[in-house]
Amino acid sequence: SEVRANFISDGNDYANFGDLTKDQIESVKWNCNRSRKYGLVAYNECLEKFINKAEGGTLFDEQIAKKPKNNIEKLEQSVVYIEMVLTNYTKKQELTFGSGSGVIISNKEIATNCHVAMAEPDAKDLDFAKKDLKWNLKNDKIEELLWIQLLNGKDWAEAKLIKKNEKKDICIIKHNPKELFKVAMKPIKEFSSFDSLKKGNFVRAMGSPGGLIGHTSTGDIQWLGTAEAMSRNFPNILEGFDKDTKFIVHGAKIHSGSSGGPLFDDDGNIIGLNTLISDTAAENIAVSADHIKDLLYSN
């Protein structure tokens, strides 16, 4: 009993940690702390599991969404700020008429909302271009462009719409690198399925509302269901979405400009795209990442 008491108190000092750094060793031991009370065999099995993860470079991805520093720095690499821009080649001027957020899902592709990727300048924007910028809207060479920026606030690139499902409000845009304008594409780790989610699960929202680059907030899942189920309380929802659209209502605060930004679970996997803010309740609504995956792999 004295040996067991010392083991539970001190852990196994004889594990082979190979070339792991001090921080990695501490993290391995921390992850296996609970298994110590079940004995040496259980503890050694846990150590082996997490040592392999550390050697494979995935250990620190295990719970990045809950670890403030590592989480934000890691997840930010896969999130982009999106600007919708009118480019007047005749006048050599640009006019930004909207912004949103997006998430990198492959080495070339970014998911966002269609109401971001397919936004059009409104009458106020066009009036400003005509009266204040002196654009000739009929004769000047003008093009609508999407620009993406990493959350480092430095690197910019063009992007083009390549796939859309407007009744799910999911669009996929493609990074269009040029010599001076390109970004490092670091995709999200994995998609988490809608069926794996439960009410009360931790979530983290990321985006750039109002041009506030890299805004993040946390909360938990409050409701899971389809647009058809939601229509009982929000009848107008079916005007914009298919009945089978999967929604996640959560407590991570989002704002105008958060649209298209990712919603992550506690493992740093994407579970949805933030899409709606309820007008009648303090609810933040994301469309399931299942719909991103369906569109990504569709023909």
Q: Where do the PLM segments sit?
A:
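Conserved positions in beta-strands of structured domains
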Residues: 103-105, 160-163, 222, 255
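Sec-exported extracytoplasmic/periplasmic mature domains
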Residues: 33, 37, 51-52, 122, ...
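Intrinsically disordered, low-complexity Ser/Thr- and acidic-rich flexible linkers and loops
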Residues: 90-93, 123-138, 233-239
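Conserved active-site neighborhood of the chymotrypsin/trypsin-like protease fold
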Residues: 108-126, 134, 139-207, 211-215, ...
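Short, flexible surface segments
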Residues: 101, 107, 193, 199, ...
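Active-site region of chymotrypsin-like
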Residues: 76-94, 176-190, 215-299
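A conserved glycine-rich beta-strand in the N-terminal activation segment of trypsin-fold
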Residues: 63-69, 79, 86-107, 113, ...
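N-terminal targeting leaders that route proteins to membranes or the secretory/organellar pathways
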Residues: 1-74
